[in-house]
A protein has these predicted regions:
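Register position in tetratricopeptide repeats
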Residues: 493, 527, 557-561
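Polytopic membrane enzymes that build or remodel cell-surface glycoconjugates and lipids
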Residues: 1-482, 486-487
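Start-of-helix register in tetratricopeptide repeats
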Residues: 482, 516, 550-553
Length: 563
């Protein structure tokens, strides 16, 4: 069990270095009062209570949030280990189930975003409830309370108590299993009814975002999730959060294999006929969703597939043991060695795939290809730059991203599409990552206002101006007109002379006497070979700001036009 926990931490270690995802920032905005937080029953524990306690305690430091998420994941590994060992009566089976589950690459988004903490919370409460149920006696009476906490962490576990009706190694009759599970089954039914009612009439789980359909999309969604699980070549499962039309061949083949295992290993102590329904019951609530096919939805269902793998290994181990008349046959040792090798190989492959996902950049940029990681990294860069500039004080900030230099990338694939055009319907990655600035205000209380500018706009003279490099890094330019002058100089230095001229001309319309703006504006004419216009603008600088140090430099150069 300890080895499985250590392996889990090693493979999932990169999650500790992450920042906040967009959904994290949205919830933090609710906590600090920048968004209206409507009262809600669903996700009461994982959203309202957790963030209500964590935000005042941890503030904008992302590490403690991720430590809690990873700690919950390790807890689930240990709970799954105990549950499988108790059902399968095999430590080898438990190692396989816990090892495969803990070190999976599928948990990238469940552990990378704090907002998805409902997934590990729900699984922890569910496994805890089932372990108490298995113990019997007074412990069984507490189990429904834990399951209620599971549903209030993530409602998708609502159907899982049905697996308690499946036969176990104890040989209890169906009537006895039904009697023991009745409290949790009734609770499950009540929650399911409430969920259906709230999904129809509630804003939180209703509306277009949670639109449902009950046709061929159910099968297509199931095949999509199945392919994400079984395709070892894909380092980016769930990169496009939508049904994958290519998933059917692989998904269907994997489903046939699963059904075959259910039949072949039906006499196992922990038969696949237990884990397979877990997989399906945990997925059923999300399969009808038309617009949502998210990787983190696999967190709880994948525990069922891990049980299938563990149960099959335990069954093979028992078959090998049954062939010996005395002692432990060599076949058992071989099964155990093979099981450990499978877990280690799976962990190594997952580690490689996660490394690819964390390090791959969009072509021609230093920005992450993965859309969730991309937004998180961009938000971190903005937070670092603004926090350093304000240094604990207050101020207004604006991010300058000239529209003439924008390039449109697909938010799904990260591929460059074309240069941006006016009214194209695109949005800046920076504005999207910061929820139009509200996320930055939630992280830094000293930010009184945040804006995103594509050109000089009147009314921003007292704003601290920032810009963004092709690596996603944000950097301070200066306040108001000074910031635009420096932005113009940067554009000229990178060869973007005409965009610089357009930018500076707009700023000069409000600040015609600002010497740095005028000087950089004159430089744009120099680099396009229009010496007459350059001399004219330098002469205007001398006339409007004769006492500025730049005016002295112009006089010494003798380049200004004389009246």
């Amino acid at each position: 069990m300890v080895a499985c926990a250590v392996l889990t931490v090693w493979v999932q270690r990169r999650a500790l270095g992450g920042f906040f995802a967009l959904d994290d920032l949205v919830i933090m905005e609710e906590v600090v009062g920048l968004r209206e937080a409507a009262p809600r029953l669903w996700r009461l524990i994982s959203r309202t209570l957790f963030f209500g306690a964590a935000v005042p305690l941890f503030g904008p430091n992302a590490l403690p949030y991720h430590v809690v998420s990873l700690a919950l994941h390790v807890l689930n590994v240990t709970l799954l280990f105990r549950f499988v060992r108790g059902r399968a009566h095999s430590t080898t089976a438990a190692v396989v189930a816990a090892g495969l589950f803990g070190a999976s690459r599928l948990h990238f988004s469940a552990l990378g975003s704090v907002a998805t903490i409902g997934e590990p919370l729900a699984l922890a409460f569910t496994l805890g409830a089932f372990l108490l149920h298995e113990r019997g006696g007074r412990a069984r009476r507490i189990a429904p309370l834990l399951f209620a906490c599971a549903v209030l962490s993530k409602e998708s576990v609502v159907l899982l108590p049905a697996v308690l009706l499946l036969p176990g190694a104890g040989g209890a009759s169906f009537r006895e299993r039904l009697r023991h599970a009745m409290p949790m089954l009734l609770l499950s039914a009540l929650f399911a009814i409430a969920l259906v009612v709230s999904s129809v009439g509630g804003a939180h789980l209703g509306g277009e975002a949670y639109a449902r359909a009950y046709g061929g999309n159910l099968f297509a969604n199931l095949m999509t999730y199945t392919r994400w699980v079984v395709d070892p070549r894909d380092a980016f499962p769930g990169q496009v959060s939508a049904i994958d039309p290519r998933a059917v061949p692989i998904g269907a083949l994997a489903t046939v294999v699963l059904l075959a295992l259910v039949w072949v290993a039906r006499r196992a102590a922990l038969p696949p006929a237990f884990g397979a329904p877990w997989w399906l019951l945990a997925l059923l609530p999300v399969l009808p969703l038309v617009h949502h096919s998210y990787l983190y939805y696999l967190y709880v269902p994948f525990a069922g597939l891990a049980m299938v793998a563990g149960g099959v290994v335990g069954w093979v181990e028992r078959l090998a043991a049954g062939r010996a008349h005395r002692g432990t046959p060599i076949g058992v040792h071989l099964v155990r060695l093979a099981a450990v090798a499978i877990v280690i190989a799976h962990a190594a492959r997952a580690d490689d795939m996660l490394d690819v996902r964390y390090t791959t950049r969009m072509r021609g940029t230093g920005i992450a290809l993965d859309p969730d990681l991309r937004k998180s990294e961009i938000a971190r860069h903005a937070y670092d730059a603004v926090g350093k500039k304000l240094a604990g004080g207050h101020g207004k900030v604006a991010f300058l991203l000239p529209s003439s230099l924008r390039t449109i990338y697909s938010t799904a694939t990260g591929e460059r599409i074309r240069a941006a055009v006016p009214d194209s319907g695109s949005y800046t990655m920076l504005a999207g990552a910061l929820d139009d600035g509200r996320g930055l205000r939630a992280l830094i209380p000293g930010v009184d206002s945040a804006a995103f500018l594509s050109a000089w706009t009147p009314g921003y003279a007292d704003f601290e101006i920032f810009s963004q490099s092709s690596t996603g890094q944000c950097f301070a330019l200066g306040r108001g007109a000074d910031g635009f002058a420096l932005a113009g100089a940067s554009l000229i230095g990178s060869g973007d002379v005409l965009p610089a001229r357009e930018l500076l001309a707009g700023a000069l319309g409000e600040f015609p006497d600002h010497a740095p703006l005028r000087y950089q504006y004159a430089r744009t004419f120099y680099f396009t070979g229009d010496s007459a216009a350059m001399r004219r603008e330098l002469g205007e600088l001398l006339r409007r700001a004769p006492g500025d140090p730049l005016a002295e430099r112009v006089r010494e150069s003798g380049l200004a036009a004389t009246p």
